[in-house]
Curated annotation (Swiss-Prot):
This is Dihydroorotase. Pathway: Pyrimidine metabolism; UMP biosynthesis via de novo pathway; (S)-dihydroorotate from bicarbonate: step 3/3. The lineage of its organism: Bacteria, Bacillati, Bacillota, Bacilli, Bacillales. Belongs to the metallo-dependent hydrolases superfamily. DHOase family. Class I DHOase subfamily. Binds 2 Zn(2+) ions per subunit. Zn(2+) 2 binds at residues 153, 180, 233. Substrate binds at residues 63-65, 95, 279, 310, 324-325. GO terms for molecular function: allantoinase activity; dihydroorotase activity; zinc ion binding. It catalyses: (S)-dihydroorotate + H2O = N-carbamoyl-L-aspartate + H(+). GO terms for biological process: 'de novo' UMP biosynthetic process; purine nucleobase catabolic process. It comes from Geobacillus thermodenitrificans (strain NG80-2). SUPFAM superfamilies: Composite domain of metallo-dependent hydrolases, Metallo-dependent hydrolases. Keywords: Hydrolase, Metal-binding, Pyrimidine biosynthesis, Zinc. The keyword Zinc applies.
Amino acid sequence: MAMWLKNGMSFNENGQLVRTHIKIEHGNIAAIHHEQLFEANGEDVIDVGGKLIAPGLIDVHVHLREPGGEAKETIETGTLAAAKGGFTTVAAMPNTNPVPDRKEQMEWLARRIQETAHVRVLPYASITLGQKGEELTDFAALKEAGAFAFTDDGVGVQSAGMMFEAMKRAAALDMAIVAHCEDDTLKNGGAVHDGDFARRYGIAGIPSVCEAVHIARDVLLAEATGCHYHVCHISTKESVRVVRDAKRAGICVTAEVTPHHLLLCDEDIPRLDANYKMNPPLRSRADREALIEGLLDGTIDFIATDHAPHTAAEKAKGMEAAPFGIVGLETAFPLLYTHFVKKNVFTLKQLVDWLTIKPAQCFGLQTGRLEVGAPADITVIDLETEEPIDPETFASKGNNTPFAGWRCQGWPVMTFVGGTLVWEKGRA
């Protein structure tokens, strides 16, 4: 049955925020009316009361932990967290147990997603068997089984020869290589950034060059192979410079940045709180400023959360022993809206684009836009109500966030996937 969302606000084709009414039918957007009145002909009508109607948000960097890490997260809980955060499409990283490195595992994952996911899930396949960096997977078979792209995220592919061959195979299949960039010989056994915080507490630090050197190697390999090479969670000013230079040279490279690297630097870490431990680590203030500049000038293409849930017991082990990672799906939009749009650093249109159409364009997705005929993946967002971030209310199994207590506006209140309401604020 058809349905209308009425009295919302969305961006028209000229980038202006205007009153909007959207008709949803057969899972797609059937009509969009701006300003003018419309008459419902027996269809259900939801009055969104002037709230923002945005395309469903897209996150291409999420750890759902299943299979093997169900104590931290499952496909069901992680995708419910995604829906609560306004995300209608997420891409699931392959650092699970077992790793989706064979056709049979990819097929199992596809079935599990079909059975339990609340939103669309795009599964990554690994570049190497077991993510061990020793032997390449069967890219063609994994693509046939539904792989979204190839990555060994969580570790960097250390062998240049291995990465070169991976890029050649990916390019032949018109698939992307998505890279976690760390040179293991430069990691220094670090738990935080190699900066003032590390020196103050006597903790081994991860130097910026560890990431930038790896990216520099890979962009040259991408140039040689013609592969689409995507940089995960870029974090340093040197890395931004390398990607900027590569784009100017016409190399097919894209990059993402996380909300936490835009919002925080190592100066913000209070004592030895492991909820501030992630990889890459929070870098310097100069790095943070370079990331913001890189996002604004197009060097960095979009924002992705790197949602990485862990148990409370794991994070209680302290800064050096606790695992890397924080959750992000339920806090990304409110944090970015409150601390960048409300402060006139970003425009609302820029923020929405970085979380929707930009990742969709980078990876050739059909979602991420409000257009007649497009899938009705839609998020309704309340830009006015201010609430604190409360980890105890998270849908995710993980509550490992450095943003507890931060007061934010810009909270999603309804999320639709293919025209179906999958989450609504206040509804059990």
